[in-house]
From Swiss-Prot:
This is Cathepsin L 2. One of its GO terms (biological process) is proteolysis involved in protein catabolic process. Its EC number is 3.4.22.15. PANTHER family: CYSTEINE PROTEASE FAMILY C1-RELATED. InterPro entries: Papain-like_cys_pep_sf (IPR038765), Pept_cys_AS (IPR000169), Peptidase_C1A (IPR013128), Peptidase_C1A_C (IPR000668), Peptidase_C1A_papain-like (IPR039417), Prot_inhib_I29 (IPR013201). The keyword Protease applies. May be involved in extracellular digestion. The keyword Hydrolase applies. Its main location: secreted. Gene3D superfamilies: Cysteine proteinases. It is found in: Secreted. It comes from Paramecium tetraurelia. Disulfide bonds join C132-C175, C166-C207, C259-C302.
């Protein structure tokens, strides 16, 4: 193992010595991420979790999966998988949601599309949901911000907190989870505040009913029925998608292919490669993954084709 600059990245091509001083690596990691714990007991527990995660990444390096993507000791290295999932993977799929059947035979046959690198669009910086299960709000706002620029040539920085605090009547539950279509419904009925007027706090709050909500461009939403339709939709706009993000905890780079279709996280599809790999905008900050993004193997990987949708703008 070696430290590459400021990154605690485990190089796939390097043999990991059994003589590594895990305690020193842990100390470097804590310094990088400014971690301090409230008690010696908590410190010992977090070191144990860190060590377990280090061993998991070592084992991954020896597997065949490491040929297509890499892992690292990132900001989640002191969290167990259960803690990570309960904190960050809080998508609430409605019982009434119609999920598309998986299409194992889908193959993308188009050209590359990448809305993160398009001269017609001022691509917004990747945001960080923090320790709040508000992925659904960031997915909806991400699609709204980018698509409003693409389709209407208007630029906004919109408020996820407005959705967290105020869309409860639409069956969303703030930091305990929600659904992108429900967020689009809320915005269609009420408009949406700008971030400067309703800033993000990463916690549930009381709805600010008196705040101005100047964003009134949503007329509804469209649910996408298949991988084929998703591939067509990304040609013209970004798309909110639901995925299984359990295997994403330590993702660093490359094309991830192994996951289930248990939908637990809301993100934004922002591109597709010529080989069919999907490019995803996440909400865990720009230091996670590929500048805040992840690439998934083509087809219905991680359930990406199960429930895509996008807002209808006007």
């Amino acid at each position: 193992m070696m430290l590459l600059g400021a990154s605690l990245y485990l190089n796939n091509t390097q043999e990991v010595s059994d003589e590594i001083d895990t305690a020193n690596l842990y100390a470097n990691w804590k310094m990088k991420y400014n971690r301090r714990y409230t008690s010696q007991r908590d410190e010992m527990y977090r070191f144990k979790v860190f060590s377990d995660n280090l061993n998991y990444i070592r084992a991954f390096q020896d597997s065949t999966e490491s040929a297509t993507y890499t892992l690292e000791l990132n900001q989640f290295a002191d969290m167990s998988q259960q803690e990570f999932a309960s904190t960050y993977l809080s998508l609430r799929v409605p019982k009434t949601a119609k999920l598309n059947a998986s299409n194992a035979n889908f193959q993308y046959k188009g050209a590359e599309v990448d809305w993160t690198d398009n001269k017609k669009v001022k691509y917004p910086a990747v945001k960080n949901q923090g320790s709040c299960g508000s992925c659904w709000a960031f997915s909806a706002v991400g699609a709204l911000e980018i698509n409003t620029d693409i389709e209407l040539n208007k630029k906004y920085e919109l408020s996820e907190q407005d959705l967290v605090d105020c869309s409860g009547p639409y069956d969303n539950e703030g930091c305990n989870g929600g659904w992108m279509d429900s967020a689009f419904e809320y915005v269609a009925d009420n408009g949406l505040a700008e971030a400067k007027d309703y800033p993000y706090t990463a916690k549930d709050g009381t709805c600010k009913t008196s705040v101005k909500r100047p964003y009134t461009h949503v007329q509804g939403f469209t649910d996408i029925d298949s991988c084929d339709e998703l591939a067509q939709a990304i040609q013209e706009r970004t798309v909110s998608v639901a995925v299984d993000a359990n295997p994403w905890q330590f993702y660093r780079s490359g094309v991830l292919s192994k996951c289930t279709k248990n939908l637990n996280h809301g993100v934004v599809l922002v591109g597709v490669q010529a080989d069919g790999a999907w490019k995803i905008r996440n909400s865990w900050g720009s230091s996670w993954g590929e500048a805040g993004h992840i690439r998934l193997a083509g087809g219905d990987t991680c359930g990406i084709c199960a429930a895509p949708s996008f807002p209808i703008l006007g």
